Amino acid sequence: MPVILNFSSERVLSESELEALRHVGRVSQSEQLVVRGRTMRLHHISFMDSFSVEPVSGGLLDRLSARGHRLLAENLEIQLNRGHTFLQAFRLYMEQSRATPCTRQNVSSAIQNKINSHAFTVSHQDFSCHEQHLNCPITLCIPETGVFVRNAKNSEICSLYDHNALTELIRRNAPHPLSREPFVPEMIVSKDECHFNLIEQYFCILATQNICTRI
């Protein structure tokens, strides 16, 4: 049974009405609409979560006012796509799809460069802590070559990681194993920046060792 809308080319639907219509489109993928006596077809394009509204010609009213029919469909389409026609939304999606791999590749390169520059040979004698605090969160072993990483992007708490295990995570674009955030260069910390807090029993940024927030 078609969805019947009381809608004109000048009317703006409420967000609740639009969300209800989006839900119908997402569930059925293709749904027939009747708008002011004119038949239209609503399509949901799932891979970009956008909507296309197409006039369905056939009746005398459609043939006599084809332009008005198209404008009505376009207005509804723009509202469903939050200000874009489907073609505009598709072009924007393609532009973002082309840009994202390049951007992520640049970020990954920056992270790897920082990992390599901050890596160091791990020696237990260099640290005033029990060996258990030197275990890598990935391998659960003390690394031969390690690098300090923040526990989250905005955390002042750090952990020691195995260089090779961390490099593999970056290569796979895997999230941070503790915070589940995407890795960013700011998470990588040099050995000189870290200090083991004997009271709290964790590594933290040297400048903020007295006000570290546990994360």
UniProtKB/Swiss-Prot annotation:
Post-translational modification: Two sizes of protein are detected upon expression in C.rodentium; only the smaller protein is secreted.
Enzyme class: transferase
GO biological process assignments: biological process involved in symbiotic interaction
Keyword Protease: no
Taxonomy, superkingdom: Bacteria
Positions of region (RING/U-box domain): 136-189
Function comment: Effector proteins function to alter host cell physiology and promote bacterial survival in host tissues. This protein is an E3 ubiquitin-protein ligase that probably interferes with the host's ubiquitination pathway and targets host proteins for proteasomal degradation. Can ubiquitinate ubiquitin, giving rise to polyubiquitin chains (in vitro). Does not complement an nleG8 deletion in C.rodentium.
Record text about domains: Interacts with PDZ domain of host GOPC via NleG8's C-terminal residues.
Similarity comment: Belongs to the NleG E3 ligase family.
Full protein name: E3 ubiquitin-protein ligase NleG
Species for this entry: Escherichia coli O157:H7
